[in-house]
């Protein structure tokens, strides 16, 4: 079982939010600037 979040936010905030998420231990990170979308999870390390 893995903790995961899907978040919508302005793309201008993605970079700072992702840096903070990494510090908190999230390893699966996906983002789509065109959709203002960020996915975070505690699964294996990967980025898309």
Where is each model-derived feature located?
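Catalytic cores and adjacent binding grooves of peptidoglycan-active enzymes
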Residues: 1-48
